[in-house]
Amino acid sequence: MNRVQRSIWERIPIWRDKYLNRWRIWQLARKVAGQAKPTPGEKPVIFFNASTRLDYMSQNGAFSLLSSWGLRLAGTPVVHFVCQRGMSRCTLSSTERNYFEAMPCDKCINLSKVAFTGAQVQSFTFSQDAALAEALAGLTVEQYVKFEYQGLAYGEIVLPSVRWCKRRHNLQDDETTRTLFNEFILSAYHIRREFQALLDKSDPKAVIVFNGLMFPEAIAKLTAQERGIPVVMHEVGYQPFSGFLTTREATAREIELGDDFQLTEAQEARLEQYLEQRFAGSFTMAGIQFWPEMSKLDESFLAKAAEFKQIVPVFTNVIFDTSQPHANVVYEHMFAWLDDLLAVIKVHPETLFVIRAHPDEMRMGKASHETVKQWVQRNHVEALANVVFIHSEEFISSYELIQRSKFMIVYNSSIGLEGALLGKAVLCGGEAWYAHFPTVYFPKSAAAFRQQADALLKAEQIAVPKEFQRNARRLLYYQNYRAALPFD
């Protein structure tokens, strides 16, 4: 079998699963269309997600579709706002592999036709605004970021999408970055006009969009909110095949947890079962398994650790992750926080700091172009005797590391909540979603962060408030099983 034949043979199962999946979706869509009976006089709900899938149905795309089916079967009219070559460039077709390639619009449209069989659809097709295009001509990246048009900060609206596509926070002033800004702003402006027309026509009672941060959904969210229309955003939950829906910011994962919510024995047991799997590395999120295996700390590490008074692990994030705009409150970005932390590390030679890169930082097909490994190399961090760096492809148990630590430092990673749950003191540099509750230490300024870190490092013992661990358990359970909806 030659290379071409082998390639075709390997693709057959993928093609088979793809078309079997489409057949199932089409069958279900027809059944829903046959059984859905809209309540007379009820206002519709608009669904829009242009940043969840292209040729294959993603989990977020499925969550949106299933939610729309549920509403239709309950008698609520639904209108799908659907892209049909509606942007000059979209986020999913603008990653590093295909910045300037033609977009796969035909494939995306074909899947939309299957998914929305028998549903009410309002499609939109792109047309460029000449005046806006002229205003955008020749701008630098800095000027794009600050760009406003007709009273709206389009540069800021598309900025998270550009960072996500470029896989970095600190953007370079190069052709691809300028092109993405230009095309995303032109597309966002067009979506706004089309969405305004749809709102005028349908007068919806609510709008449901994917995460609200990628520019197509962000501009739709803003347009609806200007009119006082409730907007629900959705993201993947922490449980497999679960979705988190909120009227706040989905990527910030804000929830309300009352003091009256206490775990029952059955709920405690359910949480323990989840934690047992989590601590073993047996979990997925958005269909991604971050840990193919999880190794214990080896003898060489333990021997090095024995030379120090204490161990403090430092957990980082992926710099372009959609949680970062919410986390960057005290510091401009995660690397600014690491720069500050490095100064603390240098004046505490008695402490072994273990800096851990996020396991998703170098994921195939989504590898970051601005990494913690680069920061470590640039700052000669591994030359420091009291630092061990664990890169993203080393599958060492973070939980064993936490158990051996005096306390832990995180930016805004979810492992901070798990550390609090294990009874450890946790110091956050970024605003994590769980930092809104009494679970961790989150200083409100860079100076306060340095002072808190110094105090924790010098303390002979750390008396963690008992409420931190109790709240961590309540919060994790609520996030997993109350705030998120199961779609399996």
Which role fits each region the language model picked out?
Residues 1-48, 70-189, 236-292:
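Conserved N-terminal ligand/cofactor-binding loop architecture of enzyme catalytic domains
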Residues 57-80, 221, 333-346:
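Histidine-anchored nucleotide/phosphate-binding helix
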Residues 191-246:
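Conserved nucleotide-sugar donor-interacting segment of glycosyltransferase catalytic cores
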Residues 280-378:
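Conserved catalytic-core segment of nucleotide-activated headgroup transferases in glycan assembly
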Residues 51-63, 209, 323-325:
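A short, glycine/small-residue-rich beta-strand->loop->alpha-helix junction that serves as a flexible
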Residues 252-299, 439-488:
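Leloir-type glycosyltransferase catalytic cores
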Residues 372-392:
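Nucleotide-activated donor-binding/catalytic signature segment of Leloir-type glycosyltransferases, i.e.
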Residues 216, 394-441:
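A donor-sugar binding/catalytic signature common to diverse glycosyltransferases
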